[in-house]
């Protein structure tokens, strides 16, 4: 593990401070470069379009996510947003990930 992150949008009052963005920055800082083509990014829920764009720009080698996001997920709005060489694995522990996200947002409200 070269980087870990979580959503900091409320803490930083920054709508771009999603966990994926934080993790990409952390990994790039550790590696000393902006390309993550030999890295795997694991996330609880499908990235949004903004995060998918960052994942593409970082040329992330693999993306693994649990729950799909039917409202804001990149697949709904920009299915081709990721780098063409990025391997996508979806549905890993999907039910558990969906429950985590439901609890997370319930605590925010």
Which ranges hold each PLM region?
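Immediate flanking context of iron-sulfur cluster ligation sites
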Residues: 33-46
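A structural microfeature
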Residues: 2-3
């Amino acid at each position: 593990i070269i980087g870990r992150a979580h959503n900091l949008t409320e803490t930083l009052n920054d709508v771009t401070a999603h966990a994926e963005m934080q993790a990409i920055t952390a990994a790039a800082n550790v590696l000393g470069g902006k390309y993550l083509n030999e890295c795997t990014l694991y996330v609880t829920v499908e990235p949004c379009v903004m995060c998918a764009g960052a994942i593409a720009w970082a040329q992330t080698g693999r993306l693994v996510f649990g729950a799909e996001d039917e409202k804001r997920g990149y697949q709904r709005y920009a299915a081709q947003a990721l780098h063409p060489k990025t391997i996508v694995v979806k549905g890993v522990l999907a039910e558990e990930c969906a429950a985590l996200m439901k609890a997370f947002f319930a605590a925010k409200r």
